[in-house]
């Protein structure tokens, strides 16, 4: 235990390596190919077009360009970098917890380990398009540390960088004042003034680049703060982080998981209530809600599947701090047992997640490779089914046309259905001249109207099944 307290970074790094390094050979997926196509054709010239992004996050995209240049578009080395970022963020959480939030060493170390292992982080680590969430959280935590060290220039620099990595960075001043209250530090009003000026200047530059203040998915999505929506999403994230229902294979296991978590958290909560520390509970809840507000109107499919886990990357910080505090509050022998069980369970769940990412990568690689082999001189090709996701992990919701463009294949592609693959050898079967779905769910249709007009103008109809493409005769093509 003494060794753990003296060298926490070593222990945290070993857990991070064991959890993620074996899976770093995951390739590029979905939206990655869109960015890669523009990078291949324009390189750093993408800056003049705001990187073809509806959001204004230039710092993230500049970091992406640097990584693509330095590592020559090697996905393995890029994911190694993302794993290192994840480790560094965990170390920052440890430092802030022990130096500024008055956590005991055991609580601080445990919080950092939980951040590494909580089984919702894989999307932010293994999807190149999600690296902005890592960059923003890292820069936000560095800005918070600068605030506590009273380094105003450093704070301003990292605050500016964080809000231009991801819009959630705008919440940084709220975090520092909330943490100041928790640490009983005197608030530094000069920081509030500088933060206000930075936000104003950032919004002006944002408007000049995007032509609007909101951007992204638009005002209807981002500014729709209906009370019912807010309560529903916050409730959804509570279910996600406090039940781990996604990993329960039966209702009995789900009940067991919930009872276990309640039994761990109850002594700590009762202690706070007994000592009338309602302000700390309220503060924790406030920080958790602030972490969710920037993504409040975005999908929360991550309760049941991996998809959209990146939206909870920020919110996982107050969660792991709370878990770390609760576990360390238990009596010594019970604490050690609960720590061992928690770390083992989180590690196992994370490995299960990462294996799905490996599957998605294999599916994307095979699909694109086989498609490239099939296409020769066709002008128009109709694709029956494109893998949208594999067990929740994005595969090729976007990117098919971008990949072919990168390979200088000029065939015009029509896509009928994007589908969820539940197993790698899923796809479509074509029996008795009828198209039937096989081990797959339709996600959405792109060309549902005048379908046969599209088909009649195509040179080739292809469907994907069991890792191979099959051709369909246009004259015999019917839909079940």
PLM region spans:
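Polytopic membrane enzymes that build or remodel cell-surface glycoconjugates and lipids
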Residues: 2-480
């Amino acid at each position: 235990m003494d060794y753990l307290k003296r060298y926490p970074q070593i222990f945290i790094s070993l857990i991070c390596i064991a959890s993620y390094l074996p899976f770093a050979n995951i390739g590029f997926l979905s939206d990655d190919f869109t960015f890669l196509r523009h990078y291949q054709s324009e390189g750093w010239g993408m800056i003049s077009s705001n990187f073809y992004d509806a959001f204004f996050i230039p710092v993230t995209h500049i970091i992406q360009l640097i990584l693509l240049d330095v590592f020559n578009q090697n996905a393995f080395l890029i994911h190694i970098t993302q794993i290192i970022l994840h480790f560094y963020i965990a170390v920052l959480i440890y430092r802030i917890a022990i130096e500024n939030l008055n956590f005991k060493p055991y609580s601080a170390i445990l919080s950092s380990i939980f951040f590494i292992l909580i089984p919702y982080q894989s999307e932010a680590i293994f999807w190149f398009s999600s690296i902005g969430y890592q960059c923003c959280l890292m820069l936000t935590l560095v800005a918070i540390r600068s605030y506590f060290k009273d380094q105003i220039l450093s704070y301003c620099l990292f605050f500016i960088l964080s809000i231009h990595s991801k819009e959630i960075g705008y919440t940084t001043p709220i975090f520092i004042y909330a943490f100041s209250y928790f640490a009983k530090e005197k608030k530094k009003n000069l920081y509030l003034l500088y933060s206000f000026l930075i936000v104003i200047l950032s919004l002006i530059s944002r408007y000049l680049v995007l032509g609007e203040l909101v951007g992204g998915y638009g005002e209807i999505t981002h500014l729709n703060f209906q009370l019912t929506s807010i309560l529903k999403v916050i409730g959804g994230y509570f279910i996600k982080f406090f039940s781990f229902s996604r990993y329960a294979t039966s209702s009995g296991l789900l009940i067991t998981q919930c009872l276990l978590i309640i039994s761990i958290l109850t002594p700590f909560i009762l202690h706070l209530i007994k000592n009338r520390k309602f302000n700390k509970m309220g503060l924790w809840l406030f920080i958790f809600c602030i972490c969710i507000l920037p993504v409040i109107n975005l999908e929360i499919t991550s309760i049941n599947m991996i998809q959209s886990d990146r939206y909870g990357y920020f919110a996982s910080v107050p969660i792991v701090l709370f878990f770390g505090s609760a576990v360390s509050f238990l009596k010594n022998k019970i604490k050690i047992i609960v720590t061992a069980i928690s770390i083992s369970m989180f590690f196992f769940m994370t490995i299960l997640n990462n294996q799905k990412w490996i599957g998605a990568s294999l599916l994307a690689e095979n699909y694109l490779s086989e498609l490239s082999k099939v296409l020769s001189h066709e002008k128009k090709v109709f694709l029956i089914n494109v893998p949208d996701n594999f067990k929740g992990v994005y595969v090729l919701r976007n990117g098919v046309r971008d990949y072919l463009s990168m390979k200088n294949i000029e065939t015009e592609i029509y896509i009928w259905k994007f589908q969820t693959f539940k197993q790698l050898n899923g796809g479509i079967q074509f029996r008795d001249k009828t198209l039937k779905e096989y081990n797959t769910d339709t996600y959405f249709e792109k060309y549902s109207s005048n379908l046969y007009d599209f088909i009649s103008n195509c040179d080739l109809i292809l469907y994907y099944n069991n890792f191979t493409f099959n051709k369909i005769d246009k004259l015999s093509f019917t839909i079940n």
